[in-house]
């Protein structure tokens, strides 16, 4: 059976939907969900993700932890398998390691004279939080692929760096692909981590067959890290990291949008009403920005830039409407 005909397992922290009261289905937020929903609707897909809300946990329990069909608000249909980790483990995973530590490293946002300050609290959060949630999701994936020959598993983002190693240990025949949706920083930025944590992360992600990034510079940074931090032989021209008797392909895949989904949303009456409201509020000129409210988006710098623009060009006073549409992060 070709890889295009085999069932596909997607794994991410955040799933395509979350559930609210009364089985309300809400579309998952973030660029990862936006990017993957189009793929999921064109393949035989089971999407494994963390249960994010109390209603998600109840839905997982209702289906005995197994996959179940869902329909997104846009009408896309596929299977979802929600995994409930212990609240304590998930809190350490998300609020100590994934976001405050890994995300900051990969966006060069540490104030290195003060942070990170990695002590027992952080190392225990990695062992009993980050690794535990990765293990929970890995077990869910292994259950799904138990009877599938050479299963195809696509892992996503910085939340799940140790998961591929757990899959590889149990299923050496699996085809594992990991796409990192954020930058990959240069090797010196990773030296702030204790060696044990750093090597566990890198050996986990190098258990994949293919590792993908948005840009060639992120791809190059990752390969340089593998050479500098782990001493692996790297072929920069071919995009290969040699890990013992294995070759890991490292690729740059700029992630496309789901054009069909965008066109479908654009034709919705609600979008037309929103457009009319924007035009009603417009003066001679309109500046519209849409961002998630997180540090890497430089939201405050955008406001400052508009302030400088008005200082330098007073002729535009009262002639420009500036609207910032900020999504919770």
Regions found by a protein language model. Give the residues of each.
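Catalytic cores of carbohydrate-active enzymes across secretory and cytosolic contexts
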Residues: 1-329
């Amino acid at each position: 059976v070709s890889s295009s005909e085999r069932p596909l397992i997607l794994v991410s922290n955040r799933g395509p939907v979350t559930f609210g009261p009364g089985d309300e289905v809400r579309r998952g937020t973030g660029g990862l969900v936006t990017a993957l929903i189009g793929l999921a609707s064109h393949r035989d897909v089971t999407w494994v993700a963390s249960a994010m809300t109390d209603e998600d946990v109840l839905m997982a329990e209702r289906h005995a932890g197994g996959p179940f069909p869902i329909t997104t608000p846009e009408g896309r249909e596929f299977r979802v398998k929600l995994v409930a980790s212990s609240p304590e483990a998930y809190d350490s995973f998300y609020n100590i390691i994934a976001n405050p530590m890994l995300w900051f490293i990969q966006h060069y946002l540490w104030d290195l004279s003060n942070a990170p300050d990695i002590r027992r609290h952080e190392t225990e959060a990695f062992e009993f939080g980050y690794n535990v949630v990765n293990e929970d999701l890995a077990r869910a994936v292994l259950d799904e692929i138990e009877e599938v020959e050479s299963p195809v598993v696509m892992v996503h983002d910085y939340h799940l760096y140790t998961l591929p190693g757990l899959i590889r240990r149990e299923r050496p025949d699996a085809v594992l692909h990991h796409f990192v949706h954020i930058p990959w920083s240069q090797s010196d930025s990773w030296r702030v981590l204790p060696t044990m944590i750093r090597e566990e992360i890198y050996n986990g992600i190098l258990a994949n067959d293919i590792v993908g990034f948005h840009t060639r510079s992120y791809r190059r940074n990752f390969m340089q890290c593998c050479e500098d931090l782990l001493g692996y032989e790297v072929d920069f021209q071919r995009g290969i990291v040699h890990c013992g008797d294995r070759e890991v392909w490292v690729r740059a895949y700029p992630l496309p949008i789901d054009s069909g989904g965008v066109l479908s949303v654009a034709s919705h009456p609600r979008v037309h009403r929103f457009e009319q409201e924007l035009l009603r509020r417009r003066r001679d000129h309109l500046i519209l920005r849409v961002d998630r409210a997180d540090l890497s988006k430089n939201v405050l710098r955008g406001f400052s830039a508009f302030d400088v623009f008005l200082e330098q060009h007073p002729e535009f006073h009262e002639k420009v409407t500036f609207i910032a549409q900020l999504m919770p992060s």
